[in-house]
């Protein structure tokens, strides 16, 4: 009995201890959470009081960047993909047969018209020339003798010592000898020409390519294998295509240039369309449209003194066909695309925004021409557009590149103040930091 009562008392003690621990834990959680809740409620009440006292005065305005629409002279360009071609290309071959004795050029070098390129063995043609000269000397002697005989026959015919037939025969012999002499002279000229052809010279100025035949090979005239190819790259041409719908603008640009004795400018840009390589002028237009592609070919010429254009190089050709006067221009980022069409956000004197539908014209990556819907001098929003609504007041901020980059310390201070005054923006973004604009290209 005693042992059983001891066990019972121990059990009561153990259970009592567990209950006490549970009560202590629950009490701590209850009173601790209540304190936190009270503190949080007090803070929220304080914030509510601050907001009620301050009203809208503490609500920050949406930051935007703005630009002013200006009037400018804007050139109108037409752009097409083109290929650089040599102004002239010559395939150099031999006009005579013989062994190739020497090459007098270095592959890739610039040569001038008349420079010696190669030599064919001249000895066979020297022999032919000597033979022709010898035959000429022989026939010339025969002619001289025939002429002397004719002079004697003419004297004798006057005295009647020879017949008229003998006189006529001698006259024919003289003419025959004269013909032989002329033929011999032609043979000499031909031999000299063949001898000249054994020295192959550059027919045009330009850059020689890789040699197609080595010294020591026997060359036959008229063979399909050339010795070398010369391309004229000073100047050089670019052939490019444009849609047939652009033909009227091109023709009008040509007529305007002819009236002022000017040229139609053409620019050659690299394939990424980021760097201009050369400036030239429109040389010619093809006389027919390609029915397969609906395009027309144009050829432009460039001096290419710095050799930036190379044959068969792909370029973007831009031809200037017009110059717009007093065109209203805004940054490209200001123009947005909506369900009703293109529009811009304008700013009044109170920095309140308003949506204006516009008609756009010529544009590039930097600016766009507004044909209708906007006047020069009006301010338009270029950044922070995604948070705008009709009639809302905004804060126009200076672009970061013009402000913070010049004074990093001031920028950091302003950012810290902005973060402290507007904690609800989150992610550490300053209140006056310009919002990223959504361009028409990104929306599409």
Curated annotation (Swiss-Prot):
Q: What HAMAP family does this protein's entry cite? A: MdtA
Any single GO CC term annotated in Swiss-Prot or TrEMBL for this entry? plasma membrane
Q: Where are the compositionally biased (Low complexity) regions? A: 406-419
Q: Can you name the source organism?
A: Yersinia pseudotuberculosis serotype O:1b (strain IP 31758)
Keyword Metal-binding assigned to the entry: answer is: no
> Which family does the record assign?
Belongs to the membrane fusion protein (MFP) (TC 8.A.1) family.
Give the quaternary structure. Answer: Part of a tripartite efflux system composed of MdtA, MdtB and MdtC.
Query: What is the protein named?
Result: Multidrug resistance protein MdtA
The protein's matches in SUPFAM superfamilies, at most eight in alphabetical order, are given as: HlyD-like secretion proteins
Where would you find this protein in the cell? Answer: Cell inner membrane
Which segment of the chain is annotated as a signal peptide? 1-20
Q: Which Gene3D superfamilies match?
A: 2.40.30.170, 2.40.420.20, 2.40.50.100, Helix hairpin bin
Indicate how the chain sits in the lipid bilayer: Peripheral membrane protein
Looking at the record, which segments are called Disordered? 37-60, 398-444
The cross-references to PANTHER family, in alphabetical order and at most eight, read: MULTIDRUG RESISTANCE PROTEIN MDTA
Protein keywords = Cell inner membrane, Cell membrane, Membrane, Repeat, Signal, Transport
Q: Which GO terms describe its molecular function?
A: efflux transmembrane transporter activity
Cite the record's Polar residues compositional bias ranges. Answer: 37-52, 435-444
Pfam families per record: HlyD_D23 (PF16576)
NCBIfam families this protein is in?
A: PRK11556.1, RND_mfp
